[in-house]
Amino acid sequence: THSTSSAASDVYKRQGMVSSDVFDMGGGMEMHVERRKTCNQGTVPKHFHPAAGTLVYVLDGVSQSKSSGKWKKYSNNEYWFEKSDWVHGGEADAPDLGEACSDLLVIRVAESGKDHTVFID
């Protein structure tokens, strides 16, 4: 089941959100730029992005992703790319980062007026 208004998605949307901007790119496309700061977050709820792709840049701290097929830790000035429609979040095998904090810049391009993040119940 796909949902954009579940309790988990509402918490995630607010959790750590410092800023969120949308830029009209023309041609029916928008660029979404979010800045998120979190500590001891663990994993996020299961979701995917029906977008042209997502770039996650670590401004400060440490984060992790399985976008390469295996878990990798990223720190200051490192980034990873998430392919369109890649389902992630809620992984039972996610390494525990403990009390680690992260300051992330998330950049994604999506069709204008469409949800750029879809949560899976």
Which stretches of residues belong to each language-model region?
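Single conserved hydrophobic/aromatic residue that forms the stacking wall/gate
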Residues: 1-8, 12
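A short glycine-rich, His/Asp/Glu-containing loop-to-beta-strand
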Residues: 13-46, 107
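Short acidic-glycine-tyrosine-enriched beta hairpin
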Residues: 38, 68-86
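Histidine-centered metal-chelating micro-motifs
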Residues: 43-45, 64, 80, 84-96
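Glycine- and acidic-residue-biased ligand/ion/polar-headgroup-sensing regions
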Residues: 51-69
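Ligand-binding loop in jelly-roll beta-barrel domains
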Residues: 70, 85-115
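Short, charged, solvent-exposed linker or helix-capping segments at domain edges/interfaces
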Residues: 116-121
